[in-house]
């Protein structure tokens, strides 16, 4: 564990203007174009399912020069710049903004699609955001200031790569633990249990069809992470859902994906 964890000064969290809560705070720094960040989203989903009452997660688009340069290179204007789009989406709620970025990653990771204004529009609407309000917020200069705040947080926590997770206990005097890169699920649960210091009762995941219906597009690897089933059993269940016309199998260079054919929830 010593090689996987780094200590983070808790002053970083104080600078983030977040009041302490009776939960473990997790800062998730991500790069929307990074495959490992896309894979980590499955682990974060599982953490939310099992430990929802014990954790609070804040997603921060890693505002490094490298990431922001990629965002700028993929855009022709502010309307198709994913970094600014994410900050504008956050103004309508962080959970909806996370939903938006997940839908965007569904487009740009497996399909290798170029970001367009139309793609962003579709993902904004499908994430349950008000598109007209989103367009108005995109034109506000405070989005750039918001990115600068994120950059300050990242520098204070010495974030050097994405994905990176930083864990803080409810004790503001305790230092945080930083995990850089992608690791097996048990590494993250070990940290949560250590920080809680008391026995934790985990929640069970929803029915697999309900999970796919909510996420809309998932990988086989993600489902194996969430449910921890033998691969043969997972394949059998997915084939059954496909026969029931509830899901459709899609094949991309990044692997097999399963797309929901059920109404969005």
From Swiss-Prot:
GO terms for cellular component: cytoplasm. The keyword Phosphoprotein does not apply. Pfam families: Thioredoxin_5 (PF13743). The keyword Cytoplasm applies. It is found in: Cytoplasm. Keywords: Cytoplasm. Interacts with Spx. Belongs to the SpxH family. HAMAP family: Adapter_SpxH. Adapter protein required for efficient degradation of Spx by ClpXP under non-stress conditions. Interaction with Spx stabilizes Spx and exposes the C-terminus of Spx for recognition and proteolysis by ClpXP. This is ClpXP adapter protein SpxH. It comes from Staphylococcus haemolyticus (strain JCSC1435). The gene is spxH.
């Amino acid at each position: 564990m010593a090689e996987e964890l780094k200590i983070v000064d808790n002053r970083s969290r104080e600078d983030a203007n977040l009041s302490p809560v009776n939960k473990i705070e997790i800062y998730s720094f991500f790069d929307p174009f990074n495959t490992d960040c896309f894979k980590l989203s499955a682990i974060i989903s599982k953490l939310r399912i099992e430990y929802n009452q014990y954790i609070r997660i804040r997603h921060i688009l890693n505002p490094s020069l490298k990431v922001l340069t990629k965002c700028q290179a993929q855009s022709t204007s502010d309307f198709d710049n994913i970094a600014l789009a994410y900050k504008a989406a956050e103004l309508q709620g962080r959970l909806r903004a996370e939903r938006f970025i997940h839908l965007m990653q569904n487009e740009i990771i497996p399909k290798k699609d170029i970001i367009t204004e139309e793609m962003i529009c579709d993902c904004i609407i499908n994430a349950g955001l008000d598109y007209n309000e989103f367009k108005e917020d995109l034109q506000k200069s405070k989005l750039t200031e918001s990115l600068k705040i994120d950059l300050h947080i990242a520098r204070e926590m010495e974030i050097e790569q994405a994905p990176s997770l930083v864990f803080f206990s409810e004790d503001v005097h305790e230092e945080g633990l930083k995990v850089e890169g992608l690791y097996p699920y048990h590494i993250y649960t070990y940290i949560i249990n250590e920080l809680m210091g008391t026995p934790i009762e985990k929640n069970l995941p929803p029915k697999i069809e309900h999970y796919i219906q909510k996420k809309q597009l998932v990988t086989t690897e993600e489902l194996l992470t969430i449910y921890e089933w033998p691969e043969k059993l997972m394949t059998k269940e997915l084939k059954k859902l496909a026969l029931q016309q509830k899901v459709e199998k899609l094949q991309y260079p990044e692997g097999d994906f399963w797309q929901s054919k059920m109404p969005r929830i």
